[in-house]
Amino acid sequence: MQIGEYELTFIDVAVFVVFLVALNKIVKRMLVAKINEPAKYEIEQLEERDMTMEEIESMRREENRCLVIVEDKIYDLSGSQDLYDNNRDLFESSEGCGPEWAPICARKYPFVGHVLKN
């Protein structure tokens, strides 16, 4: 195939396609915003022990622990500060979370102990 005075060959087309693919990848890297991993909060794990509601409230205030009560079990969500902050009213209620949170907390977060009744 001839374009003007220049004859187009298979090699010319292949080089042009490779150039377009490379240019496409460069543009995508420049324009697409990179998604950063959410910040993970490193905090020392609590040893397992049973606690009263007063002790739990004290640890929430003084040590900034994100302790959650699910079915009389205490889980430490301190490593997921954003999740805790977004659901603070639910997590800090004296009744604790509903049973739908039990499998999530048991699978993902460290078990701290049981709630002792006064």
UniProtKB/Swiss-Prot annotation:
Tree of life domain: Eukaryota
InterPro entries: Cyt_B5-like_heme/steroid_sf (IPR036400)
Protein name: Uncharacterized protein K10D2.5
Species for this entry: Caenorhabditis elegans
